């Protein structure tokens, strides 16, 4: 397989001000990306979690918005933590990604093509922001963290009278919007334990880091700011930066 080099350029996000390095692939490269992504789709559909919503057809912002709007009103939703994976796309370990794909993909020709496409990206690690295949691979990679949250964020409790051991979830809800992670729980103590575990899992298993400035807040005391909206128990608003940008565009 032969492709023209990927052309990279910088783009400043209008709301966050973050600088993104975007890769523009040749038409031939994009075709192979699409063919490979289509062939891998049964795997992606099986692995990507229900509440991973970014870049998933039929989900996206609208799906995340509906879910958060509903969950923020539940009596069990008392505290929340919003985590951000630092430089997610550039930090994805290709070694780990290839190991996961080797385990999950049985077709050697498809695996070889996937590895070849991954190796076209600049640097030794990371995926290409702007690539059709990369957005699916990123969701696939993070699905391991999502399922860890769903299946392993619990603690055991022993009944002193009967000795019976029961498991209780540390969180009530989890939602991934690509590298933004929302955890909702009943207590600050449980949520703190949950955050430590997912942070350790990301570091140890996926070689990713959580941004150190994450914090925990009480639902209703402050809004959940995610996917461009601010969520309160009794109403949902538009993030201020998006509203101001839309107003400026309208005035033009």
Language model region names:
Residues 4-6, 175-179, 213:
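Short Gly/Ser/Thr- and Asp/Glu-enriched loop/turn motifs at secondary-structure junctions
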Residues 209-223, 234-237:
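Short acidic, Pro/Gly- and aromatic-enriched capping/linker segments at domain boundaries
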Residues 5-33, 47-59, 118-140, 163-166:
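Short, conserved non-catalytic motifs in the polymerase core
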Residues 70-178, 182-200, 217-223:
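Conserved polymerase palm-domain catalytic core
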Residues 33-93:
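Active-site-proximal segment of RNA-dependent polymerases
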Residues 225-252:
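Active-site and adjacent loop segments of nucleotide-processing enzymes
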Residues 199-208:
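A common structural junction motif
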């Amino acid at each position: 397989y032969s492709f023209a080099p990927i052309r990279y350029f910088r783009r400043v996000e209008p709301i966050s001000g973050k600088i993104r390095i975007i890769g523009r692939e040749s038409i031939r490269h994009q075709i192979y990306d699409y063919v490979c992504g289509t062939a891998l789709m049964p795997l992606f559909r099986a692995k990507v979690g229900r509440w991973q919503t970014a870049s998933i057809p039929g989900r996206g912002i609208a799906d995340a918005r509906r879910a958060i709007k509903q969950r923020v009103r539940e009596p069990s939703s008392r505290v929340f933590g919003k985590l951000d994976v630092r430089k997610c796309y550039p930090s994805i370990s290709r070694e780990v990604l290839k190991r996961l794909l080797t385990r999950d993909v049985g077709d050697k020709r498809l695996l070889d093509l996937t590895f070849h496409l991954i190796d076209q990206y600049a640097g030794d690690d990371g995926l290409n922001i702007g690539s059709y295949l990369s957005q699916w691979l990123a969701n696939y990679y993070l699905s391991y963290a999502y399922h860890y949250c769903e299946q392993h964020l619990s603690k055991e409790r022993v009944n002193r009278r009967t000795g019976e051991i029961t498991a209780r979830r540390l969180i009530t809800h989890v939602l991934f919007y690509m590298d933004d992670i929302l955890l909702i729980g009943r207590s600050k103590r449980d949520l703190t334990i949950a955050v430590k575990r997912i942070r350790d899992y990301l570091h140890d298993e996926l070689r990713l880091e959580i941004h150190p400035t994450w914090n925990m807040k009480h639902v209703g005391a402050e809004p959940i700011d995610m996917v461009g909206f601010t969520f309160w128990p009794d109403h949902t608003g538009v993030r201020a930066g998006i509203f101001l940008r839309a107003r400026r565009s309208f005035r033009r």
